[in-house]
Amino acid sequence: MKIIDLSVPMINTAKEPYPPKIEYESHEQGAEQAAALLDLEKSDFPDEKAWAVETVTLTTHTGTHVDAPWHYAPKSEGKRARTIDELPLEWFYGDGVLFDFSDKEAGYELQIKDFEQKLTEMNYTLKPKDIVLVRSDADKHLYEENYAMIHVGVSAEATHWLIDQGIKVMGTDGWGWDIPLPQQAEQYKKTREDNILWAAHFVGKEKEYCQIEKLANLDQLPVPTGFKVACFPINIKDASGGWARPVAIFYE
């Protein structure tokens, strides 16, 4: 069995708009904490060292994470949208299907025909509960200032189409599933049309689905199909999303 990590690291130097803030406390500081907690002296601990611990400040959409339907809108399919802790875990383990769009320019908006063409090349037909992975290699720019601006996006029409094939979980190595936000804003200012801002996310109002955002290492997958994906989100009560460490699993 071979396992490939599909997550970006939680790291202070990430250039996403809402990066994590990680404060590291040393073993020596841990001894001071333990001594204060237990009414002891720091010198009571071997080598005056105890636990190391980190304090992390971040949003539920920092780093590699899964978006719940609640993230998109308060209602989905006419009912209260489900939060991350309410989703069936069965959604987050299944056959992976890699769509390699790394040849597309940053900001390109993927259409139904783009996915259909790739499926023809793969000689593959999507089936319910497949987990779709969109590769643009945006993860290679995690430490660059323009990281959130250089991914390909998926159109609302293509998102509808994927859901209609039975897909419940779809992911991207970009900062977001839609085209970059500044590009959306620029288009909206020109046309004032309602179907531009966050269009693919808002598909979740009509059809329940989840996104994985900020995947990584999709270039390391040797084949587009024939592997499993596990992408279980952290159980956060009433949350719009949850951090995940997705992996691709190849059973030999």
Segment roles from a protein language model:
Residues M1-E252:
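Active-/binding-site microenvironments in catalytic and ligand-binding cores
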